[in-house]
């Protein structure tokens, strides 16, 4: 959530930042809300002051043996007015907060303005796409030929945009997951976390999925208001909700492997074939909780950790700086990593690494203790390290052989019992 002080006192500054996203707030509407809030606040304070003065007056009159009934009746009326004013003020503040919760984060000054992915900026490329001397297959054909990737079975079990993996492909996906977690925990300094796959609404509000993006979530029916997680970012980042962390504990760095569940609302007709866009997919997520002055450096580090996985697997990719209009709701700066997909002759997103600044921390009331008296909001970051299903398809396509078998990247062979290929 954006700092309420900015919304109250510098709405033009907010609009100047949001312009990079192509978003503008109604200045007059916010000015009107602030005027009403100030008027109600002032009215409440004046009534409270009048009540306090009256209480003293009643005490003095009673002390002198006089009749204070008239003033006491007035105090009763003032009390009723105060209650009404407080209710009105609370309702207005709630209205303002709900509106504020739907405002996206302000882009960092280094983020380019732009409307969509066409305005993103390519930062770098790594690796050279392989030149095949035979007709290649996409991962769907490869998987079905091997008998290890079944979409029809998944459709029978559940519906569209689900998949079933069997045999060597299921083991290869597990190998990828283990390799990612081992790299992040043993080499990159993250603490592994196992988390619930169901979260409550407070957790989703904390990280910004609610209230604006409820249609993208799967919600359980029943007495409890539980949602399936869209990413491990939600439960892991909420570790620090309503917490005050000692400064010497920062940074906190977590890595978690979970399934992710997304309704893919608005994506009808897009990527209907294969593993690119699924309702359920696995991901290894990195989360960092840091001091504000280190968050931009932490973003570079976290992104490099995701890049390290791709480099170790020998998968060509490019690094993209997202423009304001293509960034996620809560991000102040985002890098996307896009892996080379031979069958599509293009790069596709495999990781998104974001600095959220204090946007989530303000919603979560997550702070750190600077000294005995002063606390400050932490900054939060998250990134895919990596999306496992998309990494699997990238390995399948980039390492395919003419006979339909798939070479196993060297770093994965210890997780595959020493095997060098699968067929």
Curated annotation (Swiss-Prot):
Primary location class: cytoplasm
GO cellular component: cytoplasm
Any GO BP annotation: selenocysteine biosynthetic process
Entry-linked Pfam families: Seryl_tRNA_N (PF02403), tRNA-synt_2b (PF00587)
EC number of the protein: 6.1.1.11
Binding, L-serine: 231-233, 285, 384
One GO MF term: ATP binding
Associated pathway: Aminoacyl-tRNA biosynthesis; selenocysteinyl-tRNA(Sec) biosynthesis; L-seryl-tRNA(Sec) from L-serine and tRNA(Sec): step 1/1
Enzyme class: ligase
Location of this chain's protein in the cell: Cytoplasm
Reactions listed under catalytic activity: tRNA(Ser) + L-serine + ATP = L-seryl-tRNA(Ser) + AMP + diphosphate + H(+); tRNA(Sec) + L-serine + ATP = L-seryl-tRNA(Sec) + AMP + diphosphate + H(+)
Claim: Mitochondrion is one of the keywords in the record: no
Gene3D superfamilies linked: Bira Bifunctional Protein, Domain 2, Serine-tRNA synthetase, tRNA binding domain
Record comment regarding domains: Consists of two distinct domains, a catalytic core and a N-terminal extension that is involved in tRNA binding.
Subunit structure comment from the entry: Homodimer. The tRNA molecule binds across the dimer.
Protein name (record): Serine--tRNA ligase
Organism of provenance: Acinetobacter baumannii (strain AB307-0294)
Gene for this chain: serS
